[in-house]
Amino acid sequence: TEIFPAMLRAVRLAQSRIDFVTYVYWTGDIARQMAYALAERARGGVEVRVLLDAVGAQPMSQELIDVMTSSGVELRWFRPPARWKVWEIDHRTHRKILVVDHQYAFTGGVGVAQEWEGDARNENEWRDTHFQIEGPAVDPLRATFLSDWRDAGGRASTDLEIPERPLRAGNTLLGVVDASAQIQLNTAGRAFEAIIALARERLWIGTPYFNPAERLTGLLVEAAQRGVEVRVMIPGPHIDKRVSLLSAEEQAGRLLDAGVWLHRFQPSMYHVKQVIADHTLVMFGSANFNARSVYKDEEVAVVAIDPHLNEVLAGDYLADLDRCDTIRDRNQLDRSWAAVAAGKALKPLESEM
């Protein structure tokens, strides 16, 4: 409930430039508010660039598109399906980045849709986390936007302008991970690898789509076996992709046998994307802990070193645990033969989930 007011406030106060890329732009009051806020700043002389994924943002209304473009917003679509570029259809931009005046950046898991207008108070409100960033880390986030913008044919007139700023804006050390499609693990996947390998006490993962690459699954097993408290929180009954849930269950037995805790969030769709390692390190952004994010999609992640941020996110994680069903043993999965068969049938499709 705090996310959109902060984003809208930043947009409405913009003086020079707004850069915005998102995979999800659907419907609802926030979709209308955001479109009209962007349009108003464009009419006020602010350079506004909006990049929408051509697959993920399909449900967006033409009315809101017209509101923005008629006001001077430069709106582009990322990789529209084309018969002569069929290989691009499966490689989307899953990023969610808003940069305002080189001063503020927002990133995380939140899209622009009514599903994110609450905070899991009922099954229609998704549970998610988004972050506002200031300081030097704004620049690489904007550079990540620009990589997608240029892919979509956007111009690059003054894109290289970087304002002078202090090397540090606070007590948090941030590193931005710009991940693109690769045959092997991309940089988001390698960041997951590094954090898992570094963990010594706890590794708490939140992800809406849990279908890790085989190497990441093996690293989670190794972490649990060396005494790390490994927890994975995923959606429970309210998931927007049942296929993904079945595939996650296919791997759950191996993880549970190694001592990993599996938590299913019950109130609504769980869409948080984060890793909390020990008491200092966290990772958040658009990347899911699944094969698509580490092989196929354009993603952005932020790795932060900050004991206070770690503690805050750990507190949120523990609060969410109170609303989860917890599984410690493969026998608790209580799966029917049909579900087992479905999970195995989905094995060849793991890279699609």
Language-model-derived ranges and their functions:
Residues 1-353:
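Charged, low-complexity intrinsically disordered terminal segments
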